[in-house]
């Protein structure tokens, strides 16, 4: 359930309670009776609408979407007045779900290497070339090709 729905429900309950208390007090005192609706069918909807809107202030009337107009400054003050630091710290400290190192490494490995800066430059190993001929073969070649010194 969203927070906004919960707030709306609480507001409705608050209005019902305040309405029940105020209506019982009003009945005891001598006040004007509510205007009755005429029995003629024409204009009945307009009369109902007028009766419903009598209690609302002009700036608090519902808009086309059924929302009540509120000041943006009031909403900001409501939100900024709350300090969620302690609640957030408690949540972060109480969380006991720690992922294993294998899972973390797998995720990091999956995301690594997608950008050009992450690509490692592979250095080719310089393999020492082994000669097919041994030292004895070279000496024999020298003697045959250059002759004896």
Swiss-Prot record:
Annotated Pfam families: AROS
Keyword rRNA processing assigned: no
Keywords for this protein: Nucleus
Compositional bias ranges of the Basic residues kind: 43-52
Subcellular localization, as worded in the UniProt entry: Nucleus, Nucleolus
Region (Disordered): 1-64
Biased composition (Basic and acidic residues): 8-19
Gene Ontology biological process terms, A to Z: ribosomal small subunit biogenesis
Main location: nucleus
Biased composition (Low complexity): 30-41
GO cellular component: nucleolus; small-subunit processome
Family named by the database record: Belongs to the AROS family.
Function summary: Part of the small subunit (SSU) processome, first precursor of the small eukaryotic ribosomal subunit. During the assembly of the SSU processome in the nucleolus, many ribosome biogenesis factors, an RNA chaperone and ribosomal proteins associate with the nascent pre-rRNA and work in concert to generate RNA folding, modifications, rearrangements and cleavage as well as targeted degradation of pre-ribosomal RNA by the RNA exosome. Acts as a chaperone that specifically mediates the integration of RPS19 in state post-A1. Direct regulator of SIRT1.
Quaternary structure annotation from Swiss-Prot or TrEMBL: Part of the small subunit (SSU) processome, composed of more than 70 proteins and the RNA chaperone small nucleolar RNA (snoRNA) U3.
Protein name: Active regulator of SIRT1
């Amino acid at each position: 359930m969203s927070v906004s729905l919960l707030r709306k429900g609480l507001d409705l309950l608050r209005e019902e309670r305040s309405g029940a208390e105020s209506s019982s007090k009003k009945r005891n005192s001598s006040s004007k009776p509510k205007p009755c609706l005429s029995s003629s069918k024409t204009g009945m909807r307009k009369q109902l609408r007028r009766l419903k809107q009598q209690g609302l202030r002009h700036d608090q009337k519902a808009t086309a979407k059924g929302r009540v107009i509120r000041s943006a400054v009031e909403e900001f003050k409501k939100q900024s007045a709350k300090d969620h630091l302690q609640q957030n710290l408690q949540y972060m400290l109480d969380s006991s779900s720690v992922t294993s190192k294998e899972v973390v490494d797998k995720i990091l490995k999956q995301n690594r290497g997608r950008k050009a800066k992450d690509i490692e430059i592979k250095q080719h190993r310089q393999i020492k070339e082994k000669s097919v001929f041994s030292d004895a073969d070279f000496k024999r070649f020298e003697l045959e090709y250059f002759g004896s010194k």
